[in-house]
Regions:
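Beta-propeller domains
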Residues: 93-103, 132-154, 326, 336-339
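Blade/loop signatures of beta-propeller domains
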Residues: 34-106, 255-265, 479-481, 487-490
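N-terminal Sec-pathway targeting helices
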Residues: 1-14
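Extracytoplasmic beta-rich repeat domains
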Residues: 110-121, 150-170, 192-210, 248-289, ...
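Repeat-blade elements of multi-bladed beta-propeller folds
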Residues: 78-82, 115-136, 158-182, 206-227, ...
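Blade-level signature of beta-propeller repeat domains, shared across WD40, Kelch, NHL, RCC1
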Residues: 557-599
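Short loop/turn segments that connect beta-strands within beta-propeller blades
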Residues: 141-144, 186-189, 238-241, 336-338, ...
Length: 599
């Protein structure tokens, strides 16, 4: 029946396009056609394979007691996008361990009965498991998958229909929307408490990020940096009321920009953007989540690509937006109370490949005593910075990197790796304190891009997609992807002090999901083929795996309910850009066979 519906969807979509409905309803028709396309491309998808390799030149790290375990959250909960606001993703739970993980099994499943770009970073707090879709927020029993409540919101869809999860603070939940708002809900009932607009929907700006919340403030920004005129902003809101406490521009404020709140102090001006007339400064959206150093009071904000994403030129500059294009592709450090600028780390100066800083950085103290910030953007590298002096300690490749210096010229197709949806995506690296290893999941997928000429770029209307790709095919707006039979995924385990990899795992599907190490010596993650894995954290060897029936691109978390450890996974990701199997969005809860919570 599903196959028949998919083929009918193909016919309806093509008929609609030929009748001109695509122009009238581009979001809806792109979504329908994209689902049909994904179905066709995923036919005969192979079973998952995962192969681990040890680095012969660098022996595996010795297991020692943890030196930097962030205790800012209850051990049995997972109360924030990356468990704690320092984003380490490490769990101190150890009931599921290397000796018994082979007994892991699916205990229950909650089916949302919707096709969705299900990227939600799940949270579990106060005996409730919370997640989001593009339009819904829901609360589940974390042991049984029973629905506590589910709240639906109606608003116009966006061409990039994602939501990456909720935040929790003081009995309230917070999420962003596709029409540019932040919404607050009662944790127990799902009743909406307030709504605050923080972006301009007419410029296709939206709020897909998972907020973080701390000491009365909610931190969140907006995306929209792939659309003409869209700019990234970062905000702090009062948790109780939604009032904007401060705002910070991630791209230069220019004539016509209207702040929504008090502006944090910033040295940024337009001098690093030398755009010609008809090419407004655009980009630097922030679209994943954030990291907070609660002791220092510093907020770390990942910034997205400059726009147009692809421009004529290369390493020496371009004709469309000369300069370094600050603060695009940067981690910007702000005073968490005031929004004042403190520092920035510019990872991809003058980006012409669409290589956002696409995930929150992690903050750790390494075994060697260094205070380190590590981050893995879409350029296929893991970066480590010493926070004592902001110096770069290492920049190491963690996926395939090819032909990245080739300039873009109108009329010429350029093939490069990683592509615009390659490298590190929206889930952060993780840290294993016992072995001093940083774990990073990566996408190995190459693209070809042919850029538009400057005259065409200037003619694009404000608020329209502004990638710079010359293509009539709507699925090639962000470049033409290689066949999915040629894609892959990696998990790299890298020494946090040196940047040298200790072990690496290669999957035949991209790895986008959260990566979660535990005190039981186990690492959990999944791939876009729906394969869920448990590895030995010390050497990367596969201990257990199971296909969960849909692409895994969201939260992978672990928590305990009445003393029994559980693992929850967001499964069933479907999106135009990814040729995955078409499955409804689900939350899958796993535990040990025969293990029941304490009464």
């Amino acid at each position: 029946m599903r196959k028949m519906l998919a083929f009918v969807g193909v016919l309806v979509a093509f008929a609609a396009i030929s009748g001109g409905l695509y122009l009238a309803f581009p979001v809806q028709m792109s979504t329908n056609l994209g689902l049909a396309r994904s179905y066709l491309l995923s036919l005969n998808a192979p079973a998952g394979t995962a192969t681990t390799q040890q680095n012969p030149a660098s022996p595996a790290s010795a297991y020692t007691p943890a030196v930097d375990v962030d205790a800012s959250a209850q051990t049995e909960d997972w109360p924030s996008y990356n468990r704690t606001v320092k984003s380490q993703r490490y769990s101190q739970l150890s009931q599921i361990n290397t000796k018994n993980v082979g007994r892991l099994k699916v205990l229950c499943t909650y089916d949302l009965e919707k096709f969705a770009a299900f990227e939600s970073g799940l949270i579990m707090v106060d005996n409730a498991l919370i997640g989001t879709t593009q339009f819904d927020i829901f609360s589940l029993d974390p042991a049984t998958c029973a629905e506590n409540w589910r709240t639906h919101e109606d608003y116009p869809p966006n061409l990039l229909p994602s939501n990456r999860g909720p935040a929790y603070l003081d009995g309230m939940l917070f999420r962003g929307t596709q029409d540019g708002r932040v919404l607050a809900y009662d944790f127990k009932t799902g009743k909406r408490l307030w709504a605050t607009t923080i972006s301009d929907a007419t410029l296709s700006e939206s709020v897909p990020s998972a907020p973080i919340a701390f000491e009365g403030l909610v931190y969140v920004g907006n995306s929209g940096g792939d659309f003409k005129g869209g700019k990234g902003h970062m905000y702090a809101l009062q948790a109780k009321t939604g009032k904007i406490v401060w705002e910070f521009y991630l791209a230069p404020k220019t004539d016509g920009d209207a702040p929504r709140g008090p502006l944090g102090a910033s040295p940024l001006d337009a001098s690093t953007w030398k755009n010609p007339p008809g090419m407004p400064i655009s980009g630097s959206g922030t679209w994943t989540s954030y990291t907070l150093d609660t002791r220092a009071g510093l907020l770390y904000v990942p910034g997205g690509n400059p726009s147009p994403d692809f421009v004529q030129g290369g390493p020496e500059g371009s004709s469309g937006r000369e300069g370094q294009n600050l603060y695009s592709d940067s981690v910007v450090v702000l005073d968490a109370k005031t929004g004042d600028y403190k520092n920035h780390f510019h990872l991809v100066p003058h980006d012409w490949h669409d290589w956002d800083v696409s995930n929150p950085p992690i903050l750790i103290q390494t075994r060697g005593g260094r205070q380190l910030m590590a981050v893995a953007p879409k350029d296929g590298h893991l970066y480590g910075f010493d926070l004592a002096d902001s110096s770069l300690v290492y920049r190491v490749p963690v996926t395939r990197v090819e032909n990245v210096d080739a300039p873009f010229v109108p009329g010429k197709s350029v093939h490069f790796c990683p592509g615009p949806v390659g490298g590190g995506e929206w889930n952060s690296p993780a840290y294993v304190p016992e072995t001093n290893l940083i774990l990073v999941g990566e996408v190995d997928w190459c693209y070809s891009v042919t850029v538009q000429d400057d005259k065409t770029l200037r003619g694009v209307p404000r608020g329209a997609p502004w990638t710079g790709m010359a293509a009539l095919n709507p699925f090639h707006a962000f470049g033409a992807a290689d066949r999915s039979s040629d894609w892959a995924g990696w998990v790299y385990a890298v020494d946090a002090d040196t940047g040298v990899w200790k072990w690496r795992l290669k999957s035949n599907y991209p790895i986008v999901s959260g990566i979660t190490p535990t005190a039981g010596g186990v690492v959990f993650f999944g791939d876009m083929g729906g394969n869920f894995y448990a590895l030995d954290a010390g050497n990367g060897e596969k201990l257990w795996s199971q296909n969960l029936g849909g692409a895994l691109a969201g939260g992978v978390i672990t928590y305990a309910v009445k003393g029994a450890q559980r693992v929850a996974v967001a499964a069933g990701f479907t999106m135009v850009a990814w040729p995955t199997k078409i499955r409804t969005a689900k939350v899958v809860i796993l535990g040990l066979d025969g293990d029941t919570p304490n009464q």
